[in-house]
């Protein structure tokens, strides 16, 4: 088996995790207490869904996941929630005091105490796997725990599980909506380690997803649950092929191979279609070309940046439901014929497609309508650099006055780490610029960086 372990860090990671596991359980017919009435082979571990769930001899299905937070309130909601019997109690790890929006607390002081417990759990989970394929890491980089503890854990995973893929689903601070003053610091410090210790990162941004909820689902004031439902649909679509047997399956390592042209350029945009409320769904039909066109719409991107400002290097289209390869080929050909969607000149094909016949499920009482087919796209576009330059700009404004820096230094960080991380991001922006530049004749000079 090719198992995958999910790691949910900090409040954002855990709440997105709740939505995801709720959806996985629905899709596989697993009850909130972990039983699966439809599973004929009790205790045997060779069904496709065993990539995400391990199975006990009594027929209980346990998520291969760890929830990790420095303070207990969010994890306590999982401990007392609907799915409390689903998770192994030792997989829900919480500390006593939180990181207070401070990267240094999550990374150096408070986080250090909890990270070994977490690695111990991960080691046990990994021992239960026959062929561990990699990790999915869910966190946000604006707060203290997601950024600080998230980075610390990624660094330790690189040491303990060197060659295993690490895919990040990371919530980046939004341009207009901010939840903490020091977000730019935490994001820059944390991106510094995402650059080195993850293989692919899918950028998500609350503001972009708010806009999608408002526009497409007619929710006037979207809550985090609305956002997380949409995020979990996207993540579910990306992992469908790992959990079900499909027509064209896509492995975790295939994402890497097809999407990452250079090791540092691994930050992806994602989009999902059709996002439609139940009220409207009756009156519309969504053909494969239609949903394919809409995942390329700038307004459907789950991060605030405009793909028209950049060029695509590669994209992965994951279809699910009633879709046949012939439709996909036609739709992709139509996209290629469009002049609006630009690819870099050194990557002429640029499309990787996956198809899975399992139709999308929806959470009862959720916002999304039940549809016959859906598509999720992850794309590598040079416009992602906009996200970084925005955060860098805010970082510079604060750091030029050394505002708030003493909180970080007081927790055992050195000022040098700020400038080091900032320089790394400046180099990243430059990398994106060069990759998107015309012609590939300057490749030889680029070679020294990697």
Curated annotation (Swiss-Prot):
Pfam family, one: Tubulin
Subcellular compartments: Cytoplasm, Cytoskeleton
Residues the UniProt record annotates as site (Involved in polymerization): 450
Gene Ontology annotations for the cellular component aspect, listed alphabetically: cytoplasm; microtubule; nucleus; plasma membrane
Modified-residue entries (Phosphothreonine), positions: 349
Top EC class for this record: hydrolase
Similarity annotation: Belongs to the tubulin family.
Function: Tubulin is the major constituent of microtubules, a cylinder consisting of laterally associated linear protofilaments composed of alpha- and beta-tubulin heterodimers. Microtubules grow by the addition of GTP-tubulin dimers to the microtubule end, where a stabilizing cap forms. Below the cap, tubulin dimers are in GDP-bound state, owing to GTPase activity of alpha-tubulin.
Protein known as: Tubulin alpha-1 chain
Gene behind this protein: TUBA1
């Amino acid at each position: 088996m090719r198992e995958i372990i999910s790691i949910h860090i900090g409040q954002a990671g855990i709440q997105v995790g709740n939505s995801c596991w709720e959806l996985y359980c629905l899709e596989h017919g697993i009850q909130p207490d972990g039983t699966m009435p439809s599973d004929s082979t009790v205790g045997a571990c060779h069904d496709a869904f065993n990539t995400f769930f391990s199975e006990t001899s009594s027929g209980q299905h346990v998520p291969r996941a760890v929830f990790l937070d420095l303070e207990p309130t969010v994890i306590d909601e999982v401990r007392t929630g609907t799915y409390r019997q689903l998770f192994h109690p030792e997989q829900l790890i919480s500390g006593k005091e939180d990181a207070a929006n401070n990267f240094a607390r999550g990374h150096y002081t408070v986080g250090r105490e909890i990270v070994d417990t977490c690695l111990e759990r991960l080691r046990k989970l990994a021992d239960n796997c026959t062929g561990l394929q990699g990790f999915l890491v869910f966190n946000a980089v604006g707060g203290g725990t997601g950024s600080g503890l998230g980075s610390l854990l990624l660094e330790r995973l690189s040491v303990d599980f060197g060659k295993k893929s690490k895919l990040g689903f990371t919530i980046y601070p939004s341009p207009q909506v901010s939840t903490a003053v020091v977000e730019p610091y935490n994001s820059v410090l944390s991106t510094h380690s995402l650059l080195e210790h993850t293989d692919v990162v899918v950028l998500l941004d609350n503001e972009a997803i708010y806009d999608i909820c408002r526009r497409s689902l007619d929710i006037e004031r979207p809550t985090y649950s609305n956002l997380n439902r949409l995020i979990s649909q996207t993540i579910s679509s990306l992992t469908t092929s790992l959990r079900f047997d499909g027509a064209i399956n896509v492995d975790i390592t295939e994402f890497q191979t097809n999407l990452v042209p250079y090791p540092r350029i691994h930050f992806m945009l994602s989009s999902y279609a059709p996002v439609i409320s139940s009220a409207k769904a009756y009156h519309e039909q969504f053909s494969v070309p239609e949903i394919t066109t809409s995942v390329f719409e700038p307004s459907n991107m789950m991060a605030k940046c405009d793909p028209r400002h950049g060029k695509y290097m590669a994209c992965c289209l994951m279809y699910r439901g009633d879709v046949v390869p012939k439709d996909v080929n036609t739709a992709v050909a139509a996209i290629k014929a469009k002049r609006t969607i630009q690819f870099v000149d050194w990557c002429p094909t640029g499309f990787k497609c996956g198809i899975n016949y399992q139709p999308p499920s929806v959470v009862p009482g959720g916002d999304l309508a039940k549809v016959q087919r859906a598509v999720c796209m992850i794309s590598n576009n040079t416009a992602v650099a906009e996200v970084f330059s925005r955060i860098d700009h805010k970082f510079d404004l604060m750091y030029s006055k050394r505002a708030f820096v003493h909180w970080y230094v007081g927790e055992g960080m050195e000022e040098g780490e700020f400038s080091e991380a900032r320089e790394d991001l400046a180099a990243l922006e430059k990398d994106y610029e060069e990759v998107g530049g015309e012609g590939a004749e300057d490749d030889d000079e680029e070679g020294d960086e990697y």
